[in-house]
């Protein structure tokens, strides 16, 4: 397919013309190209307008710094925390690593960054937090540009611009695209792979590149294969040289990629293990992810998908009726992904994030055809998405990150590293851990591993704590010698544990806003309590 496209040249039709005609046409062609070059924007980076590329990169960097809230624990505990342990030899590995459900390939990216910073003597805690996120922001910017380039090939610049605009103003993309989540990496790799996928009209087809990006996405997160099932089957069905495609593209790329993943995991686990198979077995075949919550089958259709799309939803529906038939495969991919994830009990918004760029294609088609209402539609999208993006990025659930900045001040500066200790009495994995403190401070949090033995009445440590917080604390810390110097908790527990705080000589040292939408165990504010000890100066706070 690529060779045919490369060998085709429209000018070859005129090879048998006279020399005079050839000179005349060539002279006109040079004049035409010169005029076009004067009118066309400068091209360079990624084959696109340099200013457009720089604008996108700058926007995603700004995006990175304007997202100062937490979303889900995995953005720290399955990436930065693991990388911190790999490089600095201290950090916490969750139960998924004991069960070998996660692979080291993705954390190795951040571990490499940490190692370089360490060798340069620049491994400050702020660099450890922000540089990995800046890296993800740059990758997301490249994915945005590739989506724009693809639509310009498939349709025209006008449609491409509207798709690009829809992508940039999506509140959920803004909220997620700079986080160190496997879902974010999966989404970026999926968008990049789509650029090289053999869609009708695409001029950037490369089976090796797109299959390599898909394989990498599956190594990072095995469920990344789900959106690609219909796309891979379509490619295989339409390919005339099926055996060549399989033997010379798919199999070599898959073998090399997963062999590299296998070797990396062998080095760090100390034994041969195929984590992708373990991950699929646990989350898909055994459906044990329901330990962390289950939802009805229609949740993605009734809540998940509408929330992720937000106010883009009516334009997505409109665009589905307008898009050409050759792009129906993208709609089929979205529907297939929603169907497969709907069959699993445990559901989260982020699971369907990888198909959001696909949806933006149809939203862009809608806006491109709204001639009369286009300005009103654009104003509606901006006014509804920008405030929501800023609110979720700067306000909602920010306390769990702010409190870690305070805990950094607790890190011992003297020769006695055991002089301070922190107990985080919150729903497990509410906050980041050593990756956001970067000192060997004694810390503890409430554990919540799932039961893999089949017990019917299983309660983890966090469950037992919340049954009766005061009694649990009194039993756990029966002697004053074992009391931690600092306690971190949501404000909803303050009345229940007040007796314990008084008897332990704790006073509130700091308070941080967390959310306007408290629920159950999660409060609106986070309190830090410090134990008053003779001769000790409290760290204080705000």
UniProtKB/Swiss-Prot annotation:
The keyword Lyase does not apply. The chain crosses the membrane at residues 52-72, 125-145, 213-233, 244-264, 304-324, 327-347, 351-371, 376-396. The gene is Pigb. Residues 1-36 are annotated as: Disordered. Alpha-1,2-mannosyltransferase that catalyzes the transfer of the third mannose, via an alpha-1,2 bond, from a dolichol-phosphate-mannose (Dol-P-Man) to an alpha-D-Man-(1->6)-2-PEtn-alpha-D-Man-(1->4)-alpha-D-GlcN-(1->6)-(1-radyl,2-acyl-sn-glycero-3-phospho)-2-acyl-inositol intermediate to generate an alpha-D-Man-(1->2)-alpha-D-Man-(1->6)-2-PEtn-alpha-D-Man-(1->4)-alpha-D-GlcN-(1->6)-(1-radyl,2-acyl-sn-glycero-3-phospho)-2-acyl-inositol (also termed H6) and participates in the nineth step of the glycosylphosphatidylinositol-anchor biosynthesis. One of its GO terms (cellular component) is endoplasmic reticulum membrane. Belongs to the glycosyltransferase 22 family. PIGB subfamily. Pathway: Glycolipid biosynthesis; glycosylphosphatidylinositol-anchor biosynthesis. It is a multi-pass membrane protein. This is GPI alpha-1,2-mannosyltransferase 3. It comes from the Eukaryota. GO terms for molecular function: alpha-1,2-mannosyltransferase activity. Its EC number is 2.4.1.-. Pfam families: Glyco_transf_22. The lineage of its organism: Eukaryota, Metazoa, Chordata, Craniata, Vertebrata. InterPro entries: GPI_mannosylTrfase (IPR005599). It is found in: Endoplasmic reticulum membrane. Keywords: Endoplasmic reticulum, Glycoprotein, Glycosyltransferase, GPI-anchor biosynthesis, Membrane, Transferase, Transmembrane, Transmembrane helix. Glycans are attached at residue 480. One of its GO terms (biological process) is GPI anchor biosynthetic process.
